[in-house]
Amino acid sequence: LPTYAQIGIWAPILLVFLRLLQGLSAGGEIGGSAVYLTEHAGSSSRGFKTSFLQLMGPLGILVSTLQIALLQSWLSPEEFLSWGWRVPFWISLILLILAFKVRMALEETPIFLQLSQSDTQSKTPLRDNFRDPETRKRMFLLFFCISAGGAVLFFCVQVYTSIFLKTAVKLPPQLVDQLSVYATLALLPLTIFAGWLSDKIGRKPVVVTGLVLGATLILPAFHLLQEIGQTATYSAGFTFAIAGILIGLSAILALVVGPQTALLAELFPTKTRNSAATLPHNLAAGWIGGLLPLIVTWLNQHWESTVAGLWYPTIFLASSAVVALLYLPETNQVNLTK
């Protein structure tokens, strides 16, 4: 993009516009991807097969972290700030072409084709979703418990840990990036395991366990990170201790997001499944996950503490756990053709 010095106020306007376009593209695909994968996955291993979709976010963070680390090691600080930061965006053009080709080659799911042939498709799915009391209730459960809970945990585990270790604990940025890579690498198989486990014992117990553990352990984990970080020995034992806490937090996140893809589709009837899953999921990511950094930062500043803001996600996760325990239905044996 042109810089502010080159085109003035149009530089940030163009950046915001492209970010909005990116958000619309990603938001429009996530629900459809979840439905598409779940309807193709079969009935006995939906949680396991669809959990691979949840790896894309952590993988994106992992790849981008490695890209930045490599560029910063190859380039001077001036070169990186001048043009080096643009390289990952150039590389993403290759992914865009590949994704477009794959997208164009995909065929509709057998369930959707059967629905099309029977002429029972909903012509106004969004309106039908809000007219049906059971669908409305399940959209709220998806929004509040599953999607918002996952967004809150994702922020705490994948985003705020790095910020906290760099700014509050004052660890070297290179060490924090290294620790973040360890945690993300651990998150990948843990997410798949959580999806598999939800096939065996049910989606609800796995998700509720993750929400409860998140509500009870987020604050103690960050307090412990701060205490260990104050030793500042940077020994192998020090690194192992910090990495262990981060991997433990990753395991909690995995319990919520592992079954999430299957749940997005299983909660709703075939004829309105895509819109019913997509709307609450994206609203939760935007409203709850998107505003979380702002709220946590404000609370930290207001209470003059580095961890006070984490009471907000703690209370939110506890509330989500209670609502999910009382009202979230078990769906791992649901018939997706209905």
Question: What role is predicted for each listed range?
Answer:
Residues K271-W303:
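A late C-terminal transmembrane helix in Major Facilitator Superfamily
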Residues T135-L187, I288-P293:
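Extracytoplasmic gate region of multi-pass secondary transporters
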Residues Y4-G27, T233-L255:
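Hydrophobic core of transmembrane alpha-helices in multi-pass small-molecule transporters
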Residues G57-R103:
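Helix-loop-helix hairpin linking two adjacent transmembrane segments in secondary transporters
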Residues F48-Q72, L95, P280-L292:
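Glycine-rich segments within core transmembrane alpha-helices of 12-TM secondary carriers
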Residues K200-L211:
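Cytoplasmic membrane-interface "Motif A"-like loop-to-helix N-cap segments
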Residues L1-G8, V212-Y234:
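C-terminal ends and interior cores of transmembrane alpha-helices
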Residues M104-P125, V334-K338:
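Flexible cytoplasmic inter-helical loops of multi-pass small-molecule transporters
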